[in-house]
Amino acid sequence: MTIEEILAGESKNVEFKENLPEKSIKYMKSVVAFANGTGGKIIFGTADKTREVVGFDKEDVFKKMDAIANAVSDSCEPAIIPDITLQTVDGKTVIVVEVSEGRQRPYYKIGRAHV
């Protein structure tokens, strides 16, 4: 993820989240939709409206990555295994969750379908 990609803004395959929401439903719909579609990325640590990179403290970032991985594992059927990485953008640490196009469609958030 580069600053140029962030400045390009959100699209049907890229979504920004400033923080990790307390309720995973706020981003789980996107994870499932990306798996049911052509894939996509959620960049945590970037404001969606202003595109400002706010980043995360290095002390908290691994806990946040674990929370994302656990939420996806606990919430999706069939299993979705995203690629969750840390990247430095503009000197700040962001979390990039990359969801590939699924091969076992349809994917569901447990309790509901999101296509």
Question: Model-found features: residue ranges?
Answer:
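Conserved N-terminal catalytic/coupling substructures associated with nucleotide/phosphate chemistry
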Residues: 1-114
